[in-house]
Structures are given as C-alpha cells and as structure tokens.
Amino acid sequence: MSEARKDTVTVVGAGLVGSLLSIYLARRGHTVELLERRPDMRRETVDGGRSINLAISTRGLHALRQVGLENEALKHAIPMRGRMIHPPQGELVYQPYGKDDSQHINAMSRGWLNAFLMTAAEATGKVRIRFKQRVTDVDFGSGALTVHDDATGEARQEPGRVVFGTDGSASAIRQALEKRPDFKGTQEQLGHGYKELTIPAGPGGAFQMEKHALHIWPRGTFMLIALPDEEGSFTCTLFLPWQGPVSFASLDTPAKLEAFFGAQFPDAKALIPDLVEAFFSRPTGSMVTVKGAPWHAGGQTLLLGDAAHAIVPFFGQGMNCGFEDCVVLDQLLGQGAGWEQVFTDFERLRKTNADAIADMAVENFVEMRDSTGDPRFLFRKAVEKVLLNAFPGEFVSRYSLVSFSHVPYRLAYQMGALTDGIVSELSEGLPRAEDVDLKRAAELIRSRLTPFMKEHADGFRTEG
C-alpha cells in the first residue's frame, strides 16, 4: 500500500489551493499532473473574475511555512493592523484587529501569490502543470477523467489516478460528485455582487490613505472596502445588492453613479479618477456559499478548498481555510494510512470547521456593513478591548481565534458565542467602557470560558 501511494496523482485546478497542494504532494514523493482550465497566468493575461487582493493570516502563513515559502511571500505583503472606518460624516474611526500590532492580517496580490506557488510547484521537479485543460467528466471507479483541451479543441481520456478537486466554487469534480445518490449539498448565492475599483498611488508612489489598515465604508445594505497594494495603490471593492433602490441594477448611468459616490463615499470618490470607466467596464462578481458532502468518492477522489466549501469573503478566510486543508491532509498522509482512510478522516476533521467559517463569514458581512459604524457596536468593541487587556489568555475574541490562531473554526465559533454573551451582559447600562466591572467579568469568564477551554483543551493547544 505504501508503494502504491507514491504513484502519480492528478490535481484539477492550479489556483492557490491546487498549486500549494501539489507542493505538499510532491514533498510526499508523488508525481503530480496539475490540470488548469485557464491559460498560464504567468505568460498571458487571465480574466479570472476573482478579487485582485486577498488577506492572508496565521493559518495561511503556517501552511506556507511548512513548505519553506512563508518568508518570500511576506516580502510581498502589507500588514493591516486594523479596520479604518469611514463614516458618512465625521472623523475616521480605527479599530485594531488584535491585542497589539503584532496581531495583524496581511494584504497580498492574489495573482502574484498564485504565480509564485505555480513556480514553486514546478521547482519541485515532480509537478507538471498543463494549461487550457477543462475537465468535463469523472469516472469515480477508476479515477479516469474526460478532459477537453481548449488549445486544440480535442477531448481525451486522462488515465485513472487518485484525483484531487481544487477547481473552485464551480468545481467540475464536485458537479460530478453531485450526480451521485449519496451527495447532499446546498449552494446559497449572496444577494449582493461586487465590483473592483482602484485608488491609484499618489505622487512618488505614496499611499493616499493609511497604508496599514483595511478601509471600510459601512452603509447598511451596502459597503465599500479597500486593501493596500505593493505599488502604493488600493484595490477597492464595492458590495451592492443586485436589485433594489440602491443596487447594481439601479446604478445604470454615469450620472447616477457619480451622484451615489458623491453622497455615500465622497472621500473615496475624490481618489478614484476613473470611477465611471472602471465601474461600467469591469465585471460584477457574484458570491456563493457551498456546503455539501461527501467530499470524497472512496479512495479515488477528494475535494479541497472552494471546491469543497466555498465561502463569502467577509472574514478573509477562504484561502486561509483552503491552505489549512493542505496542512491537515499532509498530516494525515504522514500517518501512513491508505487513501480511503485518509480521505474519510480528512472530511471528518474539516467538514464541521468549514461549515463554521462559512457561517461566520456571512455573519461578518452583516457586521462589516451594518455595525462597524454603529456607536453601540463600537462601545461593545471597547468593552471587549478592556477584557482582552485585563484577562490575557482567559478572554479571547472570536476574531483573534479565527485570524491569529490554529484553534479549529468550530471551536472559535462556539467560543465567540460565549464571549459575545459576556460582553453583552457587562455592557448593559455601562456609561463608559473603562468602568466595566472586572470582578463580575472574572466570574463570568471563569464560569463560562474557562470550562469550555478545558473541555476542548486539545483544540486550544493546536500548533501556533
């Protein structure tokens, strides 16, 4: 069995997760055929429709560290130490992400990271990437694939091998699995779409807003965000409902767009010189939450990343979760079991965690657009900050558990509900955050959080 496990395997999808997975598999001794539907993004312009920037945090960096790629990747990252809230009127409001500046997330170019991982995969000498290869069918008995070569127009059979589906939220491998009678799943489209815009660098390549922050313009049913780029620019993303009084459907003329931005985002509008041209020429992206099971067909096929569990982008964890998939799979491969056992264990370990971060991402969307500018929300955040400083190691925010630890997502979700309850109780009737009753806080923390952390000690002891 151990010898057979070193056979050639097929990975479908050379995006972020597929490229990193190929590196992990190569390091385990496998030869990898990596099939990618798109052209080689390193040589041709690719219209992927995906966001230009992403946020990489502790889980994703850990996955890169295991294969020796973290340091190089961080050379191309910009630390974001908190949210910078742009209210409709008044002063900017800064909300730090962690207990201090050491806890930050990192803005990085999706395209740069994808190209970097492709090149690193090829550098193993055991990964061959074949582009313009579109999978149209899977034989789950043998692992044989029907592949359409978009360069030649020809279809052919790819030999039967173990197959990993990392081909994104519209995964061809998952769609084939969905035809099996044992598959149960849902796909929930968010009622909002997104459009990317750019704030260019200022004179001399200077950033025109605070560099080390994720900027948010929360406006209730819609919002604008901006992440810093290496070149001094900011990639902005406008999230709007598809339909309604304020929506992509309603902003159908340059005049309406200009008036909308002038009223809602005047400071951003002043920094986006090509607003009208960019808005009407760039694609509008959709967002989906994918849940389903099983993720595997015996020991022949396994889904990872967005193919298994696509989530909306509002916790910055889609890629981080997919990279963590690679780490968990690699750990299971190191235990020497056969493929079917590895795949079964992988799904058991990852499914509940993927569902948890999917739910948290939707909740964070509501928080970002509705609450980040709400005085009551800001007051609760101030109380939370007092508790974080007064009870280090005992009181931990959900955001910190998700972004700055390896605690399983499901435990972070459950712990977050407990901490929210404590903050709500302590905030009630409080005139100032610094007046929080620390004695009462200690009682609540030690009666609710401490027992939970002890009960799940293994999860809170994960490698950091």
UniProtKB/Swiss-Prot annotation:
Is ATP-binding one of the keywords UniProt gives this record?
no
| One Pfam assignment | FAD_binding_3
Q: What cofactor requirement does the entry state?
A: FAD
User: Which SUPFAM superfamilies does this chain map to?
Assistant: FAD/NAD(P)-binding domain
What InterPro entries does this protein map onto?
FAD-bd, FAD/NAD-bd_sf, Kynurenine_monooxygenase
Function (record text): Catalyzes the hydroxylation of L-kynurenine (L-Kyn) to form 3-hydroxy-L-kynurenine (L-3OHKyn). Required for synthesis of quinolinic acid.
What is the protein name stated in its UniProt record? Answer: Kynurenine 3-monooxygenase
